[in-house]
């Protein structure tokens, strides 16, 4: 029994390990990977590895894994990566898993600066990446520092601005909050829709020379072949759409492209190594096939996948609506609960107030009763004193009468009688005055007793009103509401230093529609506004001395009103011969 070979395949978000047989082909391994991760849009992807000479290479699907120049490690190391890119992510990517893999790969390319991204776009993309990971911003959950361990912005951008890590995070948090209500899958798609407008997005660059020996870059992407000057990867100078190319071939380091226009000369360039031409050929064939496929009616398989994706998306929308409805119901219940708690607290406070008023009234009533009792005792004492004085007065009157009788009946001396009479008269006058004072005092005490009695009656009435008032309604009871292109490539064949491939352009429709495109920022007013705001904010903190060569090129393109698609239209102007002549003249 042959010994199995251990293989590790790293996707953008997982590591997969397999044991394969020595005769396992690249396609069998590839199929095992896509089956494991549930991917059906297999035509974009491939297995990438570093060969035993240290060059990056794509695994050939029609050859045994063990027969290819994979670096001998245990386990063998492969990366599952996008090899080809769609022209328009919103129109072409069907499955969520496909969208996620592209999102993660493009994000890594931007963060590592393999894809140049201007600062304001980097911050906006960072906020979409946060929405894709965390969902809606919630200040109760996403406390300060929740982004501290996240890679969100290219280091180049951070170095160019006088902002701390916290200040970068604050800016991204503000834009994260703006994406409220956006599904995570939709945030990934919005990220890709903006990223695909970046000049270096989806392009494989190769060092080449023209016949004059000028060092240039060849850019191979989903739309065709572009030529760049050596010091500018952002602005292509000449472009050839796939629909203009009928044959591609190479012999050793010489690469020949034959245009459909037979009056035009061959487009010839030279690569530094044979293996570079092999990679260019593979990418040209694969991208051309996808370019043609997109311009023909969808296959039954793709139609079925799109129908299934629409159904799944519709189902997700229904689930989202249900979740939103449930969330709103919960929020309503919470608000009602909070309202009831507030009302309960208010009622409790009112009840406490009633209790305090009742206790105060009872205390006042008790004090008034005590005061009334004291007044009553004083009144009684005054009355008793008045009665005693009245008795004394009456006795004095009787004595006076007696003396008068005695004055008549007895013979006393005039002086003695007069003296006694004067004495008793003075005494009677004093007693009469004392009696009047006591009567006035009795009247005063009777008046004060009457006032106390009136206060007592009033207090009893107030207490009766408080005690008989209906109690505050009890707080309401809270009741919770229940609730991948398959490469049609063969190996290099018997001739290891050359290969030729015919590129058919028959049966396609609207072959240059990409030239009509505009950027996401141009067609989406919200994105345009966000980018302008960010650009204005960042300009105040930018260190102009740290601008890179790409920054200078990008800013100049912006100043002249150029973008990816306007440049594309410009570099494809004129016939094929004119553009090939222009290439040779570089």
Curated annotation (Swiss-Prot):
Regulation: A head-to-tail association, of the N-terminal and C-terminal halves results in a closed conformation (inactive form) which is incapable of actin or membrane-binding.
Domain of life (superkingdom): Eukaryota
Phosphothreonine PTM sites in chain numbering: 567
Region (Disordered): 306-341, 485-564
In-chain residues carrying the UniProt-annotated modification Phosphoserine: 366, 535
SMART domains: B41, FERM_C
Record InterPro entries: Band_41_domain (IPR019749), ERM (IPR011174), ERM_C_dom (IPR011259), ERM_FERM_C (IPR041789), ERM_helical (IPR046810), Ez/rad/moesin-like (IPR000798), FERM/acyl-CoA-bd_prot_sf (IPR014352), FERM_2 (IPR035963)
Phosphotyrosine modified-residue sites: 146, 354, 478
GO cellular component entries: actin cytoskeleton; actin filament; adherens junction; apical part of cell; apical plasma membrane; basolateral plasma membrane; brush border; cell periphery
Segments carrying motif [IL]-x-C-x-x-[DE] motif: 115-120
Biased composition (Basic and acidic residues): 308-341, 507-528, 540-564
Record's comment describing the protein's domains: Has three main structural domains: an N-terminal FERM domain, a central alpha-helical domain and a C-terminal actin-binding domain.
Assembly and oligomerization: Monomer. Homodimer. Interacts with PALS1 and NHERF2. Found in a complex with EZR, PODXL and NHERF2. Interacts with MCC, PLEKHG6, PODXL, SCYL3/PACE1, NHERF1 and TMEM8B. Interacts (when phosphorylated) with FES/FPS. Interacts with dimeric S100P, the interaction may be activating through unmasking of F-actin binding sites. Identified in complexes that contain VIM, EZR, AHNAK, BFSP1, BFSP2, ANK2, PLEC, PRX and spectrin. Detected in a complex composed of at least EZR, AHNAK, PPL and PRX. Interacts with PDPN (via cytoplasmic domain); activates RHOA and promotes epithelial-mesenchymal transition.
PANTHER family xrefs: MERLIN/MOESIN/EZRIN/RADIXIN (PTHR23281)
Name listed for the protein in its UniProt record: Ezrin
């Amino acid at each position: 029994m042959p010994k199995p070979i251990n293989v590790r395949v790293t996707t953008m978000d997982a590591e997969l390990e397999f044991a394969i047989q020595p005769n396992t082909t690249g396609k069998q391994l590839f199929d095992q990977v896509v089956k494991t991760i549930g991917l059906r849009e297999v035509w974009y992807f491939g297995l990438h590895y570093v060969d035993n000479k240290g060059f990056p290479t794509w695994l050939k699907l029609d050859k045994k894994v063990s027969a290819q120049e994979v670096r001998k490690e245990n386990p063998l190391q492969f990366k599952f990566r996008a090899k080809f890119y769609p022209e328009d992510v919103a129109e072409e990517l069907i499955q969520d898993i496909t969208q996620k893999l592209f999102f993660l790969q493009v994000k890594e390319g931007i963060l590592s600066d393999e894809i140049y991204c201007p600062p304001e776009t980097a911050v906006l993309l960072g906020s979409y990446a946060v929405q894709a990971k965390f969902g809606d911003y919630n200040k109760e959950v996403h406390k300060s520092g929740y982004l501290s361990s996240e890679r969100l912005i290219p280091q180049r951008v951070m170095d160019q601005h006088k902002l701390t890590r916290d200040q970068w995070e604050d800016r991204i948090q503000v834009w994260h909050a703006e994406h409220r209500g956006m599904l995570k899958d939709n945030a990934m798609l919005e990220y890709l829709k903006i990223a695909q407008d970046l000049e270096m997005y989806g392009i494989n660059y190769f060092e080449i020379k023209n016949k004059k020996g000028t060092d240039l870059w060849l850019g191979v992407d989903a739309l065709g072949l572009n030529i760049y000057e050596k010091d500018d990867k952002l602005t292509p100078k000449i472009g050839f759409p796939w629909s203009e190319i009928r044959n591609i071939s190479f012999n050793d380091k010489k690469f020949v492209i034959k245009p459909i226009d037979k009056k035009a000369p061959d487009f010839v360039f030279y690569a530094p190594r044979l293996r570079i031409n092999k990679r260019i050929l593979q990418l040209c064939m694969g991208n051309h096939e996808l370019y043609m496929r997109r311009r023909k009616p969808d296959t039954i398989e793709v139609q079925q996948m799109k129908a299934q994706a629409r159904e799944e998306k519709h189902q997700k929308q229904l689930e989202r609506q249900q979740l939103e409805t449930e969330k709103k119901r919960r929020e309503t219940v919470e608000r009602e609960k909070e309202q009831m708690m507030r009302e309960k607290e208010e009622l409790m406070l009112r009840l406490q107030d009633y209790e305090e008023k009742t206790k105060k009234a009872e205390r006042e009533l008790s004090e008034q009763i005590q005061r009334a009792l004291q007044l009553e005792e004083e009144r009684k004492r005054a009355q008793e004193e008045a009665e005693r004085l009245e008795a004394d007065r009456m006795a004095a009157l009787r004595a006076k009468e007696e003396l008068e009788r005695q004055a008549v009946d007895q013979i006393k001396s005039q002086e003695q009688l007069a003296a006694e009479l004067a004495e008793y008269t003075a005494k009677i006058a004093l007693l009469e005055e004392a009696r009047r004072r006591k009567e006035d005092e009795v009247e005063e005490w009777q008046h004060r007793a009457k006032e106390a009695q009136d206060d007592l009656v009033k207090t009893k009435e107030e207490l009766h009103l408080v005690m008989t008032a209906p109690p505050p309604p009890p707080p309401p009871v809270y009741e919770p509401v229940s609730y991948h292109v398959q490469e049609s490539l063969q190996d290099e064949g018997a001739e290891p230093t050359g290969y030729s491939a015919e590129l058919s352009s028959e049966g396609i429709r609207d072959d240059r529609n990409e030239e009509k495109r505009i950027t996401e920022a141009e067609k989406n007013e919200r994105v345009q506004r966000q980018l302008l705001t960010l650009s204005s904010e960042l300009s105040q903190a930018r260190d102009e001395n740290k601008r890179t060569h790409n920054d200078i090129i990008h800013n100049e393109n912006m100043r002249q009103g150029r973008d990816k698609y306007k440049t594309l239209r410009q570099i494809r102007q004129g016939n094929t011969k004119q553009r090939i002549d222009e290439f040779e003249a570089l």
